[in-house]
Amino acid sequence: MRVLFFVFGVLSLMSTVPPTRSFTSNDECPSEYYHCRLKCNADEHAIRYCADFSICCKLKIIQIDGQKKW
């Protein structure tokens, strides 16, 4: 009887916890500055996965220091 209550408790807990990824979420890259690819270029880094299991890539922001003044 305890095992039956334990199984029902686990099933009810699993039904109340929301799934980790919702089907209503937007799986596309958010703007024109992002691109879905299988591999990011050297000047890009991965943001998230797209709907077709490719990677959403974004350009890296590289700040170049100006000339150092003594």
UniProtKB/Swiss-Prot annotation:
GO terms for biological process: defense response to bacterium; innate immune response. The keyword Signal applies. InterPro entries: Beta_defensin_dom (IPR025933). Its main location: secreted. It comes from the Eukaryota. It is found in: Secreted. Pfam families: Defensin_beta_2. Residues 1-22 form the signal peptide. GO terms for cellular component: extracellular space. Disulfide bonds join C29-C56, C36-C50, C40-C57. Transmembrane segments: none annotated. Keywords: Antibiotic, Antimicrobial, Defensin, Disulfide bond, Secreted, Signal. The keyword Thylakoid does not apply. Belongs to the beta-defensin family. Has antibacterial activity. This is Beta-defensin 131B.
